[in-house]
């Protein structure tokens, strides 16, 4: 961790993949520091046209939805609320810097806190 999954309409994502990966990584480094750079994992999921729905209707211009997997301890220690606010702001700024300001207002960032001992890598609890 941190692991970020960005779901973005394919029409917005196409051609912007490297820049978005870089910007999201830099957003995490901005908040945590340089030590976190090699730990940042970004998955980009391009959603094809007709496969994103809002209010029961398909849309092709939805704003990105970011899921940010983070250790629970990062949010429960002193200053955790400030860390959460900084992460949400930095990730939103990163999206807007690559996909344009029109994406900012609707971009959602969900911080998913994982308790210690509740995730693993390579078959081992991490």
Segments the model singles out, each with a brief description of its role:
Residues 1-126:
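A domain-level signal for the structural core that forms small-molecule/cofactor-binding pockets
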């Amino acid at each position: 961790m941190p692991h970020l999954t960005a779901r973005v309409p394919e029409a917005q994502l196409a051609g912007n993949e490297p820049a978005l990966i870089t910007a999201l990584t830099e957003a995490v480094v901005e908040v945590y520091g340089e030590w976190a750079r090699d730990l940042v994992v970004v998955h980009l999921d391009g959603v094809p046209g007709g496969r994103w729905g809002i209010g029961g209707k398909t849309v092709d211009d939805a704003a990105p939805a970011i899921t940010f997997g983070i250790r629970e301890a990062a949010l429960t220690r002193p200053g955790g609320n400030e860390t959460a606010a900084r992460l949400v702001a930095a990730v939103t700024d990163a999206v807007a810097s690559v996909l344009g300001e029109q994406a900012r207002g609707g971009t959602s960032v969900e911080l998913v806190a994982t308790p210690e001992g509740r995730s693993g890598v390579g078959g081992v609890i991490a």
